[in-house]
Amino acid sequence: MSNHLEAKMGDIADTVLLPGDPLRAKYIAETFLENPVCYNTVRNAFGYTGTYKGKRISVQGTGMGIPSISIYTNELISEYGVKTLFRVGTSGGMSPDVHVRDVVLAQAASTDSSIIHNTFGGGIYYAAISDFGLLDTAYHVAQDLKISVRVGNVLAEDRFYNDEMDRQKLVDYGVIATEMESTALFMLAAKYHVRALSVLTISNHLMTGESTTPEEREKSFNDMIRVALDTAAKA
């Protein structure tokens, strides 16, 4: 048991999917995993362990934002020995090359958060990147599943409502989507020498105004989930 998880040692698999929405964790477990068992209900951050294609996999809700995912990632790795982590969640499209419902594989995560400064001090602008092996596997899994994916740099923002952001400049420099967690996930994976990747779905487009419904964001986006799970099964 850790500060925020009531699981016992052995309850959580070595490989974990991390949706921000706890209800998406429940949906993934009940829809895709065989014999899912709930190991956590603390703060309604539901966590489940089951099997997928013969591999033991857990799904843990993290909540939104860098502080929240940092708590769960730290505890999963340091207290429960998790070795491979996949963020699965929504993102906002920014590039004209991505569209609503597209799947994005985050190669790297830029940020406007102070987490890098607080970790490394002034003068160091750390590049938070995903694990190349997971990224490569996920890309080829998507090809095998005939699921179109976009690979690129995403922005992990501290604020969901951020009208001051110069998004066009970010697009000009190759940022394809925005979300709120991946920088922390990639940094912690690097710190603890484990593997991490973010597999995202474009739920809305910040430039065009396209959007999906709240129900879709909770209970669909199955292409993203299948890519993450099939990659996890091979990891």
Swiss-Prot record:
SUPFAM superfamilies: Purine and uridine phosphorylases (SSF53167). The keyword Glycosyltransferase applies. Catalyzes the reversible phosphorolytic breakdown of the N-glycosidic bond in the beta-(deoxy)ribonucleoside molecules, with the formation of the corresponding free purine bases and pentose-1-phosphate. It catalyses: a purine D-ribonucleoside + phosphate = a purine nucleobase + alpha-D-ribose 1-phosphate; a purine 2'-deoxy-D-ribonucleoside + phosphate = a purine nucleobase + 2-deoxy-alpha-D-ribose 1-phosphate. This is Purine nucleoside phosphorylase DeoD-type. Phosphate binds at G20, R24, R43, R87, V88, G89, T90. NCBIfam families: deoD (TIGR00107), PRK05819.1 (NF004489). The keyword Transferase applies. A purine D-ribonucleoside binds at H4, E179, M180, E181, S203, N204. Its EC number is 2.4.2.1. It holds the Pfam family PNP_UDP_1.
